[in-house]
């Protein structure tokens, strides 16, 4: 399954707020409408929707998410927490969480277009896995600097999570450590995602 490129508002109406996909928020339906359409939701559907939240928030394909689940299963520790750490340490997500892009698709475009450096080297792979002590900077070109400056001004309301630090004057971010569960910028039950893939991974 390829990466989703359709209307983003349609997705957040169904799944709720997904800050990585779009900075828009869904319009809440009235309580009377909710009551009239209330149905018993199957456990499978609940697990499916949690999986879809991860996929759309981080902007990855079904195959990529399945691969991350397989990697997480092989690692020591909580599979769900390791899965979230793998996704959060992707370069496109780090660029987004630093406030250098308004969304993860926007961050992916910056990386693809070679505007972003990791440890002073251009990295154009959005899935690149960042690690503690990595520095994230912007290419020293007028176009690159202008794009990031505009994005930083737009994202000033967003708080940089504790596992990252960002110097807006130098446009430099630093990965301090692997993030903890509380720093995830998404309301998600990762255990349901692991259960969804229990027969596939």
UniProtKB/Swiss-Prot annotation:
Principal subcellular localization: plastid
The S4 RNA-binding domain, residue ranges: 89-150
GO molecular function: rRNA binding; structural constituent of ribosome
Domain of life: Eukaryota
The keyword S-adenosyl-L-methionine appears for this protein: no
Keyword Plastid: yes
InterPro entries: Ribosomal_uS4, Ribosomal_uS4_bac-type, Ribosomal_uS4_CS, Ribosomal_uS4_N, S4_RNA-bd, S4_RNA-bd_sf
Keyword annotations from UniProtKB, A to Z: Chloroplast, Plastid, Ribonucleoprotein, Ribosomal protein, RNA-binding, rRNA-binding
Location(s) in or outside the cell: Plastid, Chloroplast
Record's GO cellular component terms: chloroplast; small ribosomal subunit
Oligomeric and partner information: Part of the 30S ribosomal subunit. Contacts protein S5. The interaction surface between S4 and S5 is involved in control of translational fidelity.
HAMAP family cross-referenced by the UniProt entry: Ribosomal_uS4_B
Record-linked PANTHER family: 30S 40S RIBOSOMAL PROTEIN, SMALL RIBOSOMAL SUBUNIT PROTEIN US4M
Role description: One of the primary rRNA binding proteins, it binds directly to 16S rRNA where it nucleates assembly of the body of the 30S subunit.
Name this protein carries in UniProt: Small ribosomal subunit protein uS4c
Annotated source species: Physcomitrium patens (Spreading-leaved earth moss)
Lineage: Eukaryota, Viridiplantae, Streptophyta, Embryophyta, Bryophyta
């Amino acid at each position: 399954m390829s990466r989703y490129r359709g209307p983003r508002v349609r997705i957040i109406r169904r799944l709720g707020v997904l800050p990585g996909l779009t900075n828009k928020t869904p319009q809440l339906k009235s309580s009377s409408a909710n009551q009239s359409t209330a149905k018993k939701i199957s456990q499978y559907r609940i697990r499916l929707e949690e999986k879809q939240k991860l996929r759309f928030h981080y902007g990855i394909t079904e195959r990529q998410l399945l691969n991350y689940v397989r990697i997480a299963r092989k690692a020591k520790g909580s599979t769900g927490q390791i899965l979230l750490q793998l996704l959060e340490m992707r370069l496109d997500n780090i660029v987004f969480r630093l406030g250098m892009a308004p969304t993860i698709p926007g961050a992916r475009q910056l990386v693809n277009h070679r505007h972003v450096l990791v440890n002073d080297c251009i990295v154009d792979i959005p899935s690149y896995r960042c690690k503690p002590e990595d520095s994230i900077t912007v290419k020293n070109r007028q176009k690159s600097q202008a794009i990031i400056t505009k994005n930083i001004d737009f994202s000033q309301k967003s708080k940089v999570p504790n596992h990252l630090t960002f110097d807006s004057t130098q446009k430099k971010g630093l990965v301090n450590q692997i993030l903890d569960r509380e720093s995830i910028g998404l309301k998600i039950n990762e255990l349901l995602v692991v259960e969804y893939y229990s027969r596939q991974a």
